[in-house]
Amino acid sequence: MVIVTTKEGKEISLKDWQKKYGIPENSTKIGKFFSTTERKFAQDLADYGTLRVNEQLIRFMDRLREKWGKPLNVNSFNRSPEKQAQLQTAGYRAAQFSPHMVYMAVDLDTGSALESRQLAMMAEGVAKELGIKIRIGLEEYIKAGQTFVHFDCCPEYYAKGKPFHGQSHPAQWENSIEW
């Protein structure tokens, strides 16, 4: 089962999402360039029984993929608390509370530090173009020898002290869950 959370916070079926987003209905598509048959999405469906997709994130991913001009490798999408704990135990830089756990994050791997930096720069423009606030995580992963970029559209009240890219935020958002 695929559930899409709209930007208004409403949960809708894949079929309703496809109709709203102009994707062929009854297909495996969750975006113009992404489908449930892709490795990571299929794995999340198998692991959790449900694939949860955030409208803002998929619109961002689609536009970024369109501008990038070649496929993007999704290496992390949804995560359970158990999966997050496994990553921490294994020594990965994994937050206690991650936007991946609330279906608002994606890690895209380019296979190259240089291309990841280029993708992150392109993402800034895409987010601005779409009017979507996005957080970008890159440098700490590059320093650790990774080649992926973390993107999330998680509201700042979930992420104390981690503002959206280039955006200030109200002080009251600092009373939040730490991750």
Residue positions per predicted region:
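Extracytoplasmic cell-surface/polysaccharide-interacting catalytic and binding patches
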Residues: 1-65, 127, 144, 154-179
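N-terminal start-of-chain detector that recognizes signal peptides
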Residues: 45-47, 77-83, 120-126
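Generic structural signal for short, solvent-exposed loop/turn connectors between secondary structure elements
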Residues: 49-50, 67-71, 110-113
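A short linear-motif detector with a strong N-terminal bias
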Residues: 52-55, 83-89, 127-131
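Extended, low-complexity, intrinsically disordered C-terminal regulatory tails
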Residues: 58-91
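Catalytic cores and adjacent binding grooves of peptidoglycan-active enzymes
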Residues: 94-179
